């Protein structure tokens, strides 16, 4: 049959695009609301005019309230957060900030590396958190989710900052 070679290639491509040969399709996880109170230790440089730069580490425990399904009660899970940050903190000018973090869940069995980018003045920073890579249960993790944070400098203790962060709808994708 002469027309057979022309039909085999398109059918093969169609089947492969449906995931039969490539494995299951990626699954988006809607984890729910997440929040963290964090503490930072490092160096704070006073730039004058109320502007400061913080360079150091941020640590905290993220609490994620997983949405309930049916009559099941909501569950709260925790994830340890360790970050490196250089933050320009200004009362007058909205400044971009970048924070790099390792998240450890399930007694350290599951690791995720995230990059947080936000912009704002002292007290508030709005932006996104991007899942870069993961190991264990987070292997192959991707996605971007909205992020809001507050940053406060402890005037009494040298080199310490405090803050909180919130993810109203924490989501990510796993293969």
Where are the regions that the model predicts?
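Bacterial N-terminal signal peptides that target proteins for export
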Residues: 1-11
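Detector for methionine-enriched segments
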Residues: 1, 16-18, 81, 129
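Bacterial N-terminal signal peptides
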Residues: 9-19
């Amino acid at each position: 049959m002469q027309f057979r070679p022309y039909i085999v290639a398109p059918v093969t491509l169609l089947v492969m695009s449906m995931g039969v040969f490539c494995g299951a399709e990626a699954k988006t996880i809607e984890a729910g609301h997440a929040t963290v109170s964090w503490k930072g230790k490092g160096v704070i440089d006073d730039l004058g005019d109320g502007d400061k730069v913080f360079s150091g580490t941020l640590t905290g425990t993220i609490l994620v309230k997983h949405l309930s399904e049916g009559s099941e009660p909501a569950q709260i899970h925790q994830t340890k957060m360790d970050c490196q940050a250089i933050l320009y903190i200004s009362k007058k000018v909205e400044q971009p900030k970048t924070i790099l973090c390792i998240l450890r869940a399930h007694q350290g069995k599951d690791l995720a590396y995230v990059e947080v980018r936000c912009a704002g003045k002292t007290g508030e920073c709005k932006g996104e958190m991007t899942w870069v890579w993961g190991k264990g249960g987070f292997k192959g993790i991707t996605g971007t989710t909205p992020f809001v944070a507050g940053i406060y400098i402890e005037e009494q203790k040298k080199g310490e900052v405090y803050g909180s962060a919130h993810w109203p709808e924490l989501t990510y994708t796993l293969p």
